[in-house]
């Protein structure tokens, strides 16, 4: 089941407005989110126990969708360059840039949602595809889904990928069993 375990209201729009990505670092016990609509260089931390807003981290590169890879201890950001190209930025746990890789998402729209990373692999969504990038920064898989569904973010549990999907202002949780 999908139960609400707490409701938190944040009023600082400059920090948390339009936060469409959320990732967790178990080593710091912090959630990390971005607000690219206001400042595309800003990352905000939230304490996972208290849900209090923490520090704001500003980095030189734009950051849109963000994932933490607990196996490599790296943050990964997926940033649209143009309608088809995305820049994958790899950061250490202190948000120092390690590597950037430009990839062709084979999609004709800037929209870029969701991010998941594990053991060097990165998964993100465009408006109608899910894209997998391997450890070397090469696209290894692109899977289509209906255009009327918009994946907002994703995570994995017991080797099943779950996605939060926006459809006509309603949110649905989908599982992708064969991903």
Q: What does each model-identified segment do?
A:
Residues 14-23, 59-70, 106-117, 147-158:
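Repeated scaffold domains used in trafficking and secretory/extracellular systems
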Residues 3-13, 52-58, 96-108, 138-145:
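A short beta-strand motif characteristic of beta-propeller blades
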Residues 3-35:
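Blade-loop segments of beta-propeller domains
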Residues 1, 39-45, 83-90, 128-134, ...:
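Structural motif
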Residues 31-39, 77-83, 123-128, 163-169:
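Conserved beta-strand positions in repeat-built beta-propeller and related beta-rich domains
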Residues 62-108:
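Hydrophobic, aromatic-enriched interface-forming segments
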Residues 27-29, 71-73, 119-121, 158-159:
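Short coil/turn segments that connect the beta-strands within blades of beta-propeller domains
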Residues 105-133:
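Loop/turn-rich, solvent-exposed surfaces of beta-rich toroidal or solenoidal domains
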């Amino acid at each position: 089941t999908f139960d609400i375990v707490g409701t938190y209201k944040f009023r600082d729009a400059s920090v948390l407005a339009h936060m469409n990505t959320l990732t967790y670092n178990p080593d710091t016990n912090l959630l990390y989110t971005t607000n690219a609509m206001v400042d595309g260089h800003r990352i905000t931390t939230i304490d996972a126990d208290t849900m209090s807003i923490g520090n704001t981290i500003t980095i030189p590169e734009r950051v849109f969708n963000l994932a933490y890879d607990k196996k490599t201890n790296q943050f990964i950001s997926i940033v649209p360059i143009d309608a088809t190209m995305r820049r994958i930025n790899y950061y250490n746990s202190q948000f120092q840039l390690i590597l950037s890789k430009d990839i062709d998402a084979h999609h004709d729209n800037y929209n870029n949602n969701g991010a998941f990373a594990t053991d060097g692999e990165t998964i993100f969504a465009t408006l109608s595809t899910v894209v997998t990038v391997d450890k070397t920064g090469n696209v290894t898989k692109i899977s289509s889904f209906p255009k009327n569904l918009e994946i907002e973010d994703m995570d994995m549990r017991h080797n099943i990928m779950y996605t939060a999907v926006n459809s006509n202002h309603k949110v649905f949780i989908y599982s992708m069993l064969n991903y």
